[in-house]
Amino acid sequence: MSNDDIVSRIASMTALELSDLVGLLEQRFNISRIAPAPCQPGSNAVEAEQDRRDRKVFLTHSGSNKIAVIRAVRDVTKLGLKESKGLVDSAPSLVAEGLSADEAEDIRAKVEAAGAKAEVR
C-alpha cells in the first residue's frame, strides 16, 4: 500500500472513524495528547504573557549625581522629595512594582539616564 493510497483512504473517512483511528494510533505508539503550545498565534497564554504586570524596578546603585537621580526617581514614582531622597540613599531599593515589561523598561531607562544603575526583575 503506497502513501497515496493511505492518504486517499484517510480522506474518505468520517469524523467518527478518524477519531477512532487517532485513538488507535495513540495506543499503538504510546502517544498522549498534549495541550497546544502557548506560543501559537491567537493563543490566550500568549496574550496573558504580554499583559503580566509583575515586573519590579530596583535601584541598585545611586551613582555620583544623586540630585539628578533623586529627580528621576521623583518623576517616575510621584513621591515627594524626602521620600525620593530616602529611596536613593538606601540603594539598593525597590523603585516601583506591579509594572508591565514596557513600563519597567521605561522607568529603568529614565533612572539610568540620570546616572544610576537599575534593574528590572
Swiss-Prot record:
Keywords: Ribonucleoprotein, Ribosomal protein. Gene3D superfamilies: 3.30.1390.10, Single helix bin (1.20.5.710). Signal peptide: none annotated. One of its GO terms (biological process) is translation. GO terms for molecular function: mRNA binding; structural constituent of ribosome. The keyword Ribonucleoprotein applies. Belongs to the bacterial ribosomal protein bL12 family. Homodimer. Part of the ribosomal stalk of the 50S ribosomal subunit. Forms a multimeric L10(L12)X complex, where L10 forms an elongated spine to which 2 to 4 L12 dimers bind in a sequential fashion. Binds GTP-bound translation factors. This is Large ribosomal subunit protein bL12. The gene is rplL.
